[in-house]
């Protein structure tokens, strides 16, 4: 019997939704670090900022896994806490110096990879087989 997570994965595999999820997972850490390089932010603020900056095309509803991973690798740190008007604790995160270095590498790798993909997609068909 398949587990619930496997069933969900099977449902989106090979679909545009599945592709979008894979792309989001691959870029989430980079986007979090990009925002935190500008100023300390709390998680919900990051989600809203990404949604706004992408004109609603990117909606990262769960950044927590990426944030925990970035914190474990000491690329970000908890900066301070404040109480919101709704009596919720907001934990602000900031980027570390190692996080800045990691962000530069991520951006370089991302740009190199996406440029290579763009070059492939510009290729006119028919392709001739390699010999």
Feature locations, PLM:
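Short, contiguous hydrophobic alpha-helices characteristic of membrane insertion segments
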Residues: 20-22, 75, 127-128
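Beta-hairpin "wing" of winged helix-turn-helix
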Residues: 73-88
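Short, hydrophobic-biased segments on the C-terminal half of alpha helices
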Residues: 67-71
């Amino acid at each position: 019997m398949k587990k619930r997570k496997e069933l969900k994965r099977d449902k989106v595999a090979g679909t545009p939704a599945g592709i979008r999820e894979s792309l989001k997972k691959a870029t989430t850490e980079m986007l979090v670090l990009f925002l935190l390089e500008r100023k300390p932010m709390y998680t919900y603020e990051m989600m809203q900022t990404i949604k706004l900056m992408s004109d609603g095309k990117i909606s990262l509803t769960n950044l927590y896994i990426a944030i925990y991973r970035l914190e474990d690798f000491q690329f970000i740190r908890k900066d301070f806490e404040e109480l919101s008007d709704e009596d919720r604790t907001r934990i602000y995160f900031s980027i570390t110096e190692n996080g800045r270095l990691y962000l530069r590498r991520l951006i370089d790798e991302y740009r190199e990879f996406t440029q290579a993909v763009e070059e492939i997609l510009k290729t006119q068909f028919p392709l001739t087989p390699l010999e």
